[in-house]
Curated annotation (Swiss-Prot):
GO molecular function: DNA-binding transcription factor activity
GO biological process terms on file: regulation of DNA-templated transcription; response to stress
Highest taxon in the source lineage: Bacteria
Keyword set, alphabetical order: Signal
Name of the protein described by the UniProt record: Uncharacterized protein Rv2011c
Organism whose genome encodes this protein: Mycobacterium tuberculosis (strain ATCC 25618 / H37Rv)
Pfam families named among the record's database cross-references: MarR_2
Residues making up the signal peptide according to the UniProt record: 1-27
């Protein structure tokens, strides 16, 4: 079974790389990067501090800070006062940021639909269920 897990992990890494490259192409067609797209997406539901966004994305705070600064300069997001933390403002999308996110998301839906056509829906759901169980198991092992 460990050989099967190792092969699955290799496939997941390969797929993740392909999805990252595909995401870069999708975002680039709207004149943006995947890093911008990810940060726009993660703060689209509610305002977050840069450290909160970094934790959600699983990346460094410094990397997110650079992208957040870029979004602010481009008028896609703004920093607002955080009543819970004087020195860590909240990153909030502007209307322009929401429009850009929507445009990128619409392009991504086209790509996702093509991917969905390549896989049986039941097999896709079973795969996702298995991956979620593995994620839960790995999180439980964390010290």
């Amino acid at each position: 079974m460990s050989d099967e897990i190792a092969r699955l992990v290799a496939d997941v890494f390969e797929l993740a790389g392909l999805l990252r490259r595909s995401g870069e192409v999708v975002a680039a067609r709207e004149g943006h990067t995947q890093a911008r797209w990810q940060l726009l997406s993660v703060v689209s539901d509610r305002a977050l501090t840069v450290p909160q966004a970094a934790r959600r994305l699983g990346v460094t705070r410094q990397g997110v800070q650079r992208v957040a600064n870029d979004l602010v300069v481009c008028g896609l997001a703004e920093l607002r006062h955080n009543p819970d933390h004087r020195t860590s403002p909240l990153l909030v999308l502007t209307e322009n940021g929401r429009r850009v996110l929507q445009a990128i998301t619409e392009r991504a839906i086209v790509v996702n639909n093509r991917l969905a056509d390549a896989v049986d829906p039941a097999a896709l759901q079973a795969t996702r269920d298995s991956l979620r169980r593995m994620i839960v198991a790995l999180k439980a092992e964390r010290p």
